């Protein structure tokens, strides 16, 4: 905008100073054909630029409102994401969650191994479908992750605390079900042998919107995890001061 303003100012300045000083000081320049022409040109340019800037500002505002109000498939409001050192046991996770929930600002907390919304998924697993290998995004979570993030299970059941005692269980999104023709109770490769599909959840956007939907699997590792969560997703009460919650 600054460069545009400078360029627009250069020509009128050069054009006006090209006239004899006597003509300008006597006031005849304004009424002259050249004066009328340059005045009309400047008014026209100012009008066009002002209109263009207003349109651009409105477009940016509409785009911002669209992105803020777009249904991502999960409840993104009142969520704090905290990267932390990996826990060493489920008991440590439970103790940390209980401590958080002592504060009335905090409703619940879920945990996962990495960022939920990211353009680069850290883990992708492979599934054989129609004699072809197809990949899907793989995300290891705590048993209450879908509940805390507001992701609806549309078929089967959600994870439960008892799933931490099993050898791993899956919940896929609807996009994965469509792509791979998956079924409830179907068993796929897990980290510790075969793991069943216990449910399917509503589609959601785990990447920025320009990437579209992807086949996605939530996974509770069960009794013998190879790793523990490194990210906490903390749901706070509506109206909570985020700084106060983070300080806690």
Predicted regions: what they are:
Residues 36, 40, 91-95, 244:
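Short, conserved clusters of charged catalytic residues that mark active-site
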Residues 51, 90-93, 239:
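Active-site oxyanion-binding pockets that recognize sulfate/phosphate
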Residues 33, 88-89, 177, 241:
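Glycine-/small-residue-rich active-site loops that bind phosphorylated ligands and cofactors
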Residues 7-8, 56, 92, 138, ...:
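Residue-level signal for transmembrane alpha-helical positions in Major Facilitator Superfamily
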Residues 1-87:
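Alpha-helical transmembrane segments of integral membrane proteins
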Residues 68, 84-91, 123-124, 169-170:
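Short amphipathic alpha-helical patches
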Residues 95-248:
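Mid-to-C-terminal secondary-structure elements
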Residues 80-103:
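Short extracytoplasmic
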């Amino acid at each position: 905008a600054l460069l545009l303003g400078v360029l627009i100012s250069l020509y009128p300045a050069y054009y006006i100073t090209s006239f004899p000083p006597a003509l300008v000081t006597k006031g005849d320049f304004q009424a002259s054909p050249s004066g009328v022409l340059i005045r009309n040109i400047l008014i026209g340019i100012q009008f066009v630029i002002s209109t263009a800037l207003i349109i651009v500002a409105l477009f940016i505002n509409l785009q911002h409102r669209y992105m803020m109000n777009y249904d991502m498939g999960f409840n993104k409001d009142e969520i704090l994401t905290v990267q932390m050192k990996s826990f060493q046991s489920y008991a440590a996770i439970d103790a940390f969650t209980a401590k958080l929930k002592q504060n009335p600002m905090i409703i619940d907390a879920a945990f996962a191994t990495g960022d939920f919304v990211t353009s680069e998924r850290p883990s992708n697993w492979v599934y054989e479908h129609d004699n072809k290998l197809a990949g899907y995004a793989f995300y290891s979570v705590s048993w209450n992750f879908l509940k805390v993030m507001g992701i609806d299970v549309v078929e089967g059941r959600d994870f439960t605390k008892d799933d931490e005692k099993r050898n791993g269980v899956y919940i896929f999104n609807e996009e994965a079900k469509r792509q791979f023709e998956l079924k409830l109770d179907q068993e796929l490769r897990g980290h510790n042998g075969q793991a069943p599909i216990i449910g399917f959840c509503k589609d959601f956007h785990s990447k920025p919107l320009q990437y579209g939907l992807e086949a996605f699997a939530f996974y509770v590792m069960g009794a013998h995890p190879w790793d523990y969560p490194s990210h906490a997703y903390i749901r706070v009460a509506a109206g909570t001061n985020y700084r106060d919650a983070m300080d806690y």
